Regions:
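Catalytic machinery of carbohydrate-active enzymes
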Residues: 2-43
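Alpha/beta enzyme core
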Residues: 44-272, 276-287
Length: 289
């Protein structure tokens, strides 16, 4: 009944054609689970091995949990926090390097007053004391000409992914009610930015997350879906669909439609304003992160 359920059923179906039978070893509750996890936390990961951890988690977990991290102390808290629920180990799998909290922690507004270079330099301090994969919130990624250098710097440090939003102009935090000064990039221009990011990375294990701001800027579901399909075709590895209303209604409607698309990619939710949503609801609706 886990993440391999459908594969198991397919194997059983195929074996029946040959009068075969699947031999299954009973699941063993891992009594040393916490000890193994503790050992893993003490392991040093090289930048290259750390980059690939997010992709591996996507392939093995029902949902990958990230928590924001704006300094080494927060990173250590996220690194060490864990609970054991009926022999099921729960933890945050990764760290979200947020432009909002990076800016707020330095007493500045979330409008790119803290530039990318400064944020990446500060991120190095977090990387020194943590091992979890990092997803870097890069706002709109900056100028297309500068984006390759951002990608190379992040990958060199061992960051696992970058999230780039389809907004242009002066940054305005997506949770603000007034978005009248915010503008959305054209699909064509943003697809070009995604391709630049994909071409700049050294390894395909470094993931490109396309963040869609259609609901934030008052656009409809069709606009969000059109963007998701085009961004997927351009090379995005994951799609982050953002919303600022206090329920997951918008993102669930999006996921229901996008799951049926031939251009489907894993989905990311950021439940800042709809934090009452249950993890199980996100999973059943098709979200992966």
């Amino acid at each position: 009944n886990g993440i391999q359920k459908n594969i198991r059923l397919e194997v059983i179906k195929t074996l029946k054609k040959w009068n075969g039978k699947l031999i299954e070893v009973p699941y063993t509750k891992n009594s040393s689970l916490l000890k193994n996890q503790s050992k893993a936390k003490k392991t040093f990961f090289t930048p290259m091995s750390r980059v690939s951890r997010f992709r591996r988690l996507l392939e093995t977990q029902k949902i990958v949990r990230f928590i924001e991290c704006h300094n080494p102390l927060v990173g250590l808290l996220a690194e060490k926090l864990s609970i054991n629920l009926k022999n099921e180990f729960r933890e945050f799998h990764g760290l979200w390097s947020s432009s909002l909290t990076d800016s707020a922690s330095q007493g500045k507004p979330d409008n790119q007053s803290v530039e990318l270079t400064t944020r990446i330099n500060n991120l190095n301090n977090v990387i020194e004391v943590t091992n979890k994969p990092i997803l870097f919130d890069a706002d709109n990624g900056g100028r297309p000409e500068h984006l390759p250098y951002t990608i190379k710097n992040l990958e060199r440090l061992g960051v696992s992914a970058i999230a780039i939003e389809d907004k242009i102009g002066l940054k305005s935090n997506s949770l603000f009610k007034d978005q009248s000064r915010a503008n959305q990039d054209t699909i064509k221009n943003f697809c070009r930015k995604i391709k630049i990011a994909c071409n700049a990375r050294h390894s395909n294990d470094f993931l490109i997350v396309a963040r869609i701001e259609s609901f934030i800027l008052g656009q409809d579901l069709n606009d969000a879906l059109k963007r998701a399909e085009n961004f997927s075709k351009a090379g995005a590895d994951l799609i982050l669909i953002h919303s600022k209303i206090d329920t997951p209604k918008e993102i669930f409607a999006f996921a229901k439609k996008f799951k049926k698309s031939k251009y489907y990619k894993p989905l990311v939710a950021v439940p800042s304003t709809y934090s009452s949503v249950k993890e199980e609801e996100l999973i059943s609706s098709g979200f992966n992160v």
